[in-house]
Amino acid sequence: MQLSKHFTLKEMIKSMTATRKGIDNTPGAGEIKSLGDLCYEILEPLRAHFDKPVTITSGYRSEALCEAIGSKKTSQHAKGQAVDLEIFGVPNIQVAYWLENNVDFDQLIMEFFDPEDPAGGWIHISYHESGSNRKQVLTFDGKKYSEGLPEMKWSGGKVVN
């Protein structure tokens, strides 16, 4: 099922853990609508800007899958409102800065950020119906969360070490 021009339901629900453990990771109609909104409002503009495929490393998670991986059943992933992503060839911190300044989102987290490796970690981003998004921006270094994105050195619109 195509959710938007470049994103399918299959890639939004793919989970190696669900496959290995025989967990049904099929979303309901409400979650599918939320995934479609996420694709149109965040993922398509992101793909268009960088002109590169966006890799979804974690999308929808059923309650059973959340339990299997130690995630909360109330996670926005379980509502079809969140994805973890990367764009190969673009530092994750650069993608996070673009998202912060160019799309409406509920929560943006630069996960497992290491200032020595701007391409490391991954980006968690969530979206729900327009007008009710918190625009919360956090960085997680593997131990603690902090407000905002880390300051980086930029040159020519790109992050430099």
Where are these regions (language model features)?
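Short, flexible, solvent-exposed loop/turn segments with mixed acidic/basic and small polar residues
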Residues: A68-A78, F113-E116
